[in-house]
Amino acid sequence: MESPPQSQAGLARHLHGVLAELHRQPYPHVPNPPACKKRAAVALILRIRPTYDHWPSSSSTGDSSSSLSTEQRLEEFFAQPWVQHGEPEVLFIKRASRVGDRWTGHVALPGGKRDPEDADDRAAAIREASEEIGLDLTTNDCISVGNLPERVVTTSWGSVP
């Protein structure tokens, strides 16, 4: 079997390492300041696009057992030849264009404001991805690895000093 080009094989290997490290070393939770009641969350959704020369077999379509640990699921996924030859992609959305909306037309990660019924930021990101793009991130073919760095974002949009 032919080995993948160095750039693709290296990229998949490095992506595997980064995701495994993100899972092992999650970023700490950053609480909201007392005066800030709103909170938002986004989902960084990555996929590996197979190349035409290395298409996945029908048995490698994400049937990974949910009883495996995240590390095992990552190891199993990145061990597949089509993944090693594939091209990583990030999902971005383009927000709707609306008059008066400060985010109008922006390119962004799927996500949005946390609702009271959301248990945590992860739940908010999962719900928002489902609402915005119809992608269910709770299925077995999705591997939830960890959280991105949290930060407090403040704005004076529309306020008068």
Where are these regions (language model features)?
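N-terminal leader/linker segments that precede catalytic domains of diphosphate-processing enzymes
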Residues: 1-161
